[in-house]
């Protein structure tokens, strides 16, 4: 059995670790709430653009934008959104399993894939997998800006325009609630048709196009894709903070259990030491 002094040192060390994990849990909870507010604030913008795009597309019968047109799929582009940091449980591992499953499904159909990566964890993981990587962005922090995403979004858009890829998807962790984050595959291009009752009622909307529907759709579609990628990244950030909060709470609880176990061992060691001292005193008295 370890000595009492050694056990006290271990208890002090675990208590220090417990303080750190408790602080990280509280910080993650605060960041998660702020990220949820950004999620709620950005969603109406992308929803409004999506409806306007659908209105214009349905009203322009003589023009079909390539971003809205299905074509034979020979190559698929995936934007993968991961975290820059760890200590968030199995969040990234579950995401990467989903990505690998999507890549395998396409490969089995004879379809090639190319990746655009967001986050250090995705970059370090997929660079060792031998997958074609077109673009990557890291270090977005807790408050990503839209301009930080322009490169990776425009890169995939150009690949789609040039016919280098025939579909574009984004894969990220969708925030369900504090205890649940779900890896999600969302199609970006070609844009899925919006199911909305008011789209059928042409009398409820009417636009005069300046200069023309093509130019307007070009601009709106790019803005919409940027907003969708931004929304996915913010969603993933909320998932990261929730997963980190849960992981740090588990670590804090485990530290508390370990302290209790060490305290019990310390008490036994202390009791044994006192018993030995008493035995020595009794033995000495008997010898006299």
Curated annotation (Swiss-Prot):
Keyword field: ATP synthesis, Cell inner membrane, Cell membrane, CF(1), Hydrogen ion transport, Ion transport, Membrane, Transport
Keyword rRNA-binding: no
Main location: membrane
Pfam families with a match to the protein in the record: ATP-synt
Membrane topology note: Peripheral membrane protein
Record GO biological process: proton motive force-driven plasma membrane ATP synthesis
Locations listed in the record: Cell inner membrane
Record-level GO cellular component terms: plasma membrane; proton-transporting ATP synthase complex
Superkingdom in the source lineage: Bacteria
GO molecular function terms listed in the Swiss-Prot or TrEMBL record: ATP binding; proton-transporting ATP synthase activity, rotational mechanism
Record bears the keyword Iron-sulfur: no
Record PANTHER family: ATP SYNTHASE GAMMA CHAIN, ATP SYNTHASE SUBUNIT GAMMA, MITOCHONDRIAL
Assembly description: F-type ATPases have 2 components, CF(1) - the catalytic core - and CF(0) - the membrane proton channel. CF(1) has five subunits: alpha(3), beta(3), gamma(1), delta(1), epsilon(1). CF(0) has three main subunits: a, b and c.
Stated family: Belongs to the ATPase gamma chain family.
Its job: Produces ATP from ADP in the presence of a proton gradient across the membrane. The gamma chain is believed to be important in regulating ATPase activity and the flow of protons through the CF(0) complex.
Name assigned to this protein: ATP synthase gamma chain
Gene behind this protein: atpG
């Amino acid at each position: 059995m370890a000595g009492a002094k050694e056990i006290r040192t271990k208890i002090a060390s675990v208590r220090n670790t417990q303080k750190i994990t408790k602080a990280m849990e509280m910080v993650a909870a605060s960041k998660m709430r702020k990220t949820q507010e950004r999620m709620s604030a950005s969603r109406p913008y992308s929803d409004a653009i999506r409806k306007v795009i659908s209105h214009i597309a349905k009203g322009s019968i003589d023009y079909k934008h390539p971003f809205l047109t299905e074509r034979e799929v020979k190559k698929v582009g995936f934007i993968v959104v991961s975290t820059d940091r760890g200590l968030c449980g199995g969040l990234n591992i579950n995401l990467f399993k989903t990505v690998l499953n999507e890549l395998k499904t396409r490969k089995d159909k004879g379809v090639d894939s190319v990746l655009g990566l967001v986050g250090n964890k995705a970059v370090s993981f997929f660079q060792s997998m031998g997958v074609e990587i077109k673009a990557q962005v890291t270090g977005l922090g807790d408050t990503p800006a839209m301009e930080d995403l322009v490169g990776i979004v425009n890169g995939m858009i150009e690949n789609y325009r040039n016919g280098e890829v025939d579909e574009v998807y984004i894969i990220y962790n969708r925030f369900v609630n504090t205890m649940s984050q779900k890896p999600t595959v969302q199609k970006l291009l070609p844009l899925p048709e919006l199911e909305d009752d008011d789209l059928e009622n042409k009398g409820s909307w009417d636009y005069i196009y300046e200069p023309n529907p093509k130019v307007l759709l070009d601009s709106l579609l790019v803005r919409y894709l940027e907003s969708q990628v931004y929304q996915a990244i913010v969603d993933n950030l909320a998932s990261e903070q929730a997963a980190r909060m849960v992981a740090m709470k588990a670590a804090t609880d485990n530290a508390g259990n370990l302290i209790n176990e060490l305290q019990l061992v310390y008490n036994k060691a202390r009791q044994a030491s006192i018993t030995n001292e008493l035995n020595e005193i009794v033995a000495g008295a008997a010898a006299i």
